[in-house]
């Protein structure tokens, strides 16, 4: 059984494993992040290691997930089209969400690397 953790990041919950890549939504400009910057997630909801499961209420104490920013990126453009019937008017807008691609390096619980 692989070791994994469930963390809260970017307003959503993610199941993460060491050595894998993930995209997390950001609410800050891309210019504030740079490549290979270390990042630590302390909001760990659950850790599963071999046959042991640790649950937090709501978060686990002394649990962290360490990772590195691989690169910031922007998602595909979403088109919002609003049309008012019988008025012959419409409005078209676009939006691109900012993401941060990161790689998870390790999962720590009680100062032990799992």
From Swiss-Prot:
Major localisation: plastid
Database matches in InterPro entries: bL21-like, bL21-like_sf, Ribosomal_bL21
GO BP: translation
Compartmental location: Plastid, Chloroplast
Signal peptide feature range: none
Keywords: Chloroplast, Plastid, Ribonucleoprotein, Ribosomal protein, RNA-binding, rRNA-binding
GO cellular component, one term: ribosome
One Gene Ontology term of the molecular function aspect: rRNA binding
Functional description taken from the UniProt entry: This protein binds to 23S rRNA.
Family: Belongs to the bacterial ribosomal protein bL21 family.
PANTHER family: 50S RIBOSOMAL PROTEIN L21, LARGE RIBOSOMAL SUBUNIT PROTEIN BL21M
Oligomer status and interactors: Part of the 50S ribosomal subunit.
Entry protein name: Large ribosomal subunit protein bL21c
């Amino acid at each position: 059984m692989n070791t994994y953790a469930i963390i809260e990041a970017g307003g959503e919950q993610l199941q993460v494993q060491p050595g894998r890549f993930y995209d997390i939504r950001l609410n800050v400009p891309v210019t504030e992040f740079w490549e290979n910057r270390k990042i630590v997630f302390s909001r760990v909801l659950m850790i599963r290691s071999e046959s042991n499961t640790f649950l937090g209420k709501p978060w686990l104490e002394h649990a962290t997930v360490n990772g590195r920013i691989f690169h910031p990126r922007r998602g595909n453009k979403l088109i919002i089209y609003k049309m008012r019937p019988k008025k012959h008017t419409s409005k078209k807008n676009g939006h691109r969400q900012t993401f941060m691609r990161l790689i998870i390096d390790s999962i720590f619980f009680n100062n032990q690397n799992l």
